[in-house]
């Protein structure tokens, strides 16, 4: 996910992994790593149509084009969608300006027409995530895949009232609650993954820097922000795996819609 604005929520969070001017190296690697995984996972299935919900800047939808016949990116931010249309002009990539709180997704994307729905870091921003999950399931074909991520409650912190410190977060999820949400909408989790390596490396780098054992971080090296090196770092250090999933900031799942 690149934009929370698909649900007209507060806390818009735009990250472009290929923006060399953004110094958030590890965060960029994690964002890109999730899309690299989604494309790699889907490619052998040769999906006809993939929907990237809350596509934001559109770089993830572009990545998914390498695995799918067609990709549709969905976001409520009209300016973002227009920018993405101008930036990524490909015959099999389309962008839809859609606020899911204001209407049903199936009005623009046919019921049971989508091979896979991808939606990263979205559900935690919604007051009614079940409504979104129901819409995702509605447009999915039987046997279609749902690939999503949410922050792990173990990685979140609350204020003195017990509410999320990140005010754009309306929900806390653990694996059990996310699995229930998916199952209640006709899908079954088949894989749980995480990105613990990147988080561990980021923390280690911070510790060494604070202790003055190192004078520079990877994010201080301009060469690391090139497109080629961002992809390399995302694959090497931030590619979702099934190892040490509780050490990951985000819970990442692959679910499959039940056959009729």
Residue ranges of predicted features:
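Conserved catalytic-core motifs of eukaryotic protein kinase domains, centered on the activation segment
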Residues: 128-129, 159
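Conserved N-terminal segment of class I S-adenosyl-L-methionine
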Residues: 1-112, 116, 120, 130-133, ...
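Short aromatic-enriched loop/helix-cap "lid" or pocket-rim segments at secondary-structure transitions
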Residues: 158-162, 201-207
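A short glycine-rich, Lys/Arg-flanked "PGG" loop and its adjoining helix->strand segment in the class I
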Residues: 130-142
